[in-house]
Amino acid sequence: MVQQIINTAKEKMDKAVQAFTRELATIRAGRANPSLLEKVTVDYYGMPTPIIQLASISVPEARLLVIQPYDKSVIKDIEKAILSSDLGLTPSNDGSVIRITIPPLTEERRRELVKLVKKYSEDAKVAVRNIRRDANDELKKLEKNGEITEDELRGYTDDVQKLTDDHIAKIDAITKEKEKEVMEV
């Protein structure tokens, strides 16, 4: 029972770190990356559909994204969706593919992105701490019901704290790496 609580907490913390990493992938760092367009949806036959389901996205050069729609009739809709997104990207359409040149980031924009990275980082840490709290609450219930002793409770909560510290250290390392990537000119 106790090991199950700790394992569940570890799995949830791992998922929180993975979600944080996916969130960071959507922040552009001056380089072209297909994940930039992950959250952009196109109105396709009345349904909001992610671009990645409507087209293949390739990166032929460091600052160029090429979007090749499977259905040429949606090219205008894809272009409109990219323009109306808050990514600040300008697509150019030649009738069969859309090219997006990724402009170099300004110093001001880099600082804004670093703030965003820090916000995502803090959100991920809060998620990990909430998971710790839930696990500790479950352990305290076991102690209250007499299933484990007070000393065992202390040992198990220390294990949960170590898990928390490890995951927060991972988040900090990922944050530092992304900040460096964003500030790189």
From Swiss-Prot:
<dbReference type="GO" id="GO:0006415">
    <property type="term" value="P:translational termination"/>
</dbReference>
<dbReference type="GO" id="GO:0043023">
    <property type="term" value="F:ribosomal large subunit binding"/>
</dbReference>
<comment type="similarity">
    <text>Belongs to the RRF family.</text>
</comment>
<dbReference type="InterPro" id="IPR036191">
    <property type="entry name" value="RRF_sf"/>
</dbReference>
<protein>
    <recommendedName>
        <fullName>Ribosome-recycling factor</fullName>
    </recommendedName>
</protein>
<dbReference type="InterPro" id="IPR023584">
    <property type="entry name" value="Ribosome_recyc_fac_dom"/>
</dbReference>
<keyword id="KW-0648">Protein biosynthesis</keyword>
<dbReference type="GO" id="GO:0005737">
    <property type="term" value="C:cytoplasm"/>
</dbReference>
<keyword id="KW-0963">Cytoplasm</keyword>
<comment type="function">
    <text>Responsible for the release of ribosomes from messenger RNA at the termination of protein biosynthesis. May increase the efficiency of translation by recycling ribosomes from one round of translation to another.</text>
</comment>
<dbReference type="InterPro" id="IPR002661">
    <property type="entry name" value="Ribosome_recyc_fac"/>
</dbReference>
<dbReference type="Pfam" id="PF01765">
    <property type="entry name" value="RRF"/>
</dbReference>
